[in-house]
Amino acid sequence: GILLNVSCGSGSLFEPDKRNALRAPSYPLISVDPYTSVWSFADELNADVTRHWTGKEQALLGVVDVDGVSYRFMGKETPEEGASVRFATAARQLSVNVLPTQTYYTFECGPVLLDVVFTAPLLLDDLDRMSMPVNYISWQVRSADQKKHEVRVSVEAFSSLAVNTEDQAVMV
């Protein structure tokens, strides 16, 4: 199964140690093993559905609600999937930065900035941690206009993440 640990916080976690000008052919989001591997094939995280490294759709959807307005920061909703959140506004991606174990994104979502970090703790000096099938999605929200805002972040995983072919049944 997939364990998705989502955390909120503040601090240097959201600021990469190094910046690069890499324009990658795809961006790693979740990389547990060859079978559990989710990537963004688009330069903008919300321009296409997320995919397995083979190109097969493995949809994740990320939405941030700011003062009652929804902004999609990850994935692209397709009508037949019937996501629980409907929205019209795509967040504006300001940056993406890929490092060996982390991918950093920053988005403008109306009056707030959203920082999202995808972390794969695949460090060879800690084999216990490396053997755990866990990746992390962390985020922080910062006010761009120095005012307080009501914010809610949600991440949704679609059934395409759990099956090999579209005709396979998913038990809930």
Across the structure, where does each feature detected by a protein language model lie?
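Bacterial N-terminal signal peptides
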Residues: 1-5
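Accessory carbohydrate-recognition regions in carbohydrate-active enzymes
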Residues: 13-172
